[in-house]
Amino acid sequence: MSKVLAIVTGASKGFGKAIAQEIVKCNPNKNQLIDLVLFARSLDGLKSTKESIETISTNAKVIDLQSLDMSNIPDVELKFKSVLENIKWEEYSKICFFNNHGTLYHLGRIEDFSDFKNIQKDNDTNTTSFVVTTSLLVKKLKELGSQYSSEVTIVNSSSLCAIKAFPTWSLYCSSRAYRDMFFQALSLEYKLNDKFKVLNYSLGVLDTDMQSQVREECSEDDKSFYVGLKNDGKLINPNRSASICSNLVYSHKFETGSHLDYYDLDK
């Protein structure tokens, strides 16, 4: 029986860890084997994700763990390309790539920006490495030739910030919009291939370390709102959002290039 391959970036915590778990849990074919390739900065975090996956199903196997700083573009290109070269693609009938990694950036008014070197580093993490990893994957799939007919789904971890601007969130919003539009263009380049689909999945407001960072760094005007979300239990469990996304990926029944939001799907 052909296997599923799931590649996940930012897999050491938060939504990345959750999607690695849920893509295993949500497979409608419980007897199908699933191989996972996981990337993140923290190797310890990746090992924790690997251990959690192996307790979920004996059919799931983490075949590669890669500690990788996504702001180091030459290293991203070298390591990601090497990993792709070592995958036995002929074993898989379904390929899932969750391009999930990213940072919050600095929250603040544009007139107050000063650390432009760090902004450039965050841009490389959030956008340049996103382009590199996506491009290398589709290039590899093209190299496999017409005989390769697996179902492919590439998912961008998106946000409401990709389609709506918020004050003091200019850097994060613009990076999310960039990623969404990049994937929309990718979907058009492959529109004639109904087995190749691209999804911008808006995760919802998750109860993660990034949300803790938001509460610490947001403006005083916004702080009560974000603290209230936490105190009132309105933050979403990452695994709940990841299960919605996983079911979408397995169904393959969505319009390629679309932006779909957790809040519209969890009904």
UniProtKB/Swiss-Prot annotation:
It comes from Dictyostelium discoideum. Belongs to the sepiapterin reductase family. One of its GO terms (molecular function) is sepiapterin reductase (NADP+) activity. It is found in: Cytoplasm. CDD domains: SPR-like_SDR_c (cd05367). The lineage of its organism: Eukaryota, Amoebozoa, Evosea, Eumycetozoa, Dictyostelia. Pfam families: adh_short (PF00106). SUPFAM superfamilies: NAD(P)-binding Rossmann-fold domains. This is Sepiapterin reductase.
